[in-house]
């Protein structure tokens, strides 16, 4: 059976509950969030590949599940954030270009057990993966008929990566194709720094974002 988005979301929910019930003894004492994330993501990919026809990503494809255009992110409840590859400044406004599946865990260790309690599992459609504050500001400006110079001014004010040509091209695209409201917090760095606190707490109130909470 071919893996689809609907199946992915249901499997992510079931996997979260299964993962929370297991003893992950190999992670006892591990504090490196990247190691925990890799562990969870590989388990989930294996869980899916046993049941469905799918493509597993590589460093070349850049995302974990290219056949459903989805990247998997695993992050601690203490500070739900991760990094995403920077491709262009327009990702901050129009989205990353792929869906995100986010597992948020609370890790608890004893001498003999490690529990990964999945507190939140959130699926975010690609067009909701832009930055919250800049898309809100742009949508507000467009609602009162802002012009190209107004938009370029906002891009400067918000320190969007790029030069005058980038800003001019972005402003033209924003006027021609107003962005959807995004729900991530995206900070500029060599890679995008993405924070998930807002999106994991939407409680299924926004189209394009599916939330499970335990």
Predicted stretch roles:
Residues 1-66, 74-214:
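Nucleic-acid endonuclease domains
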Residues 70:
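Acidic/His-rich structured neighborhood in mature extracellular/periplasmic domains
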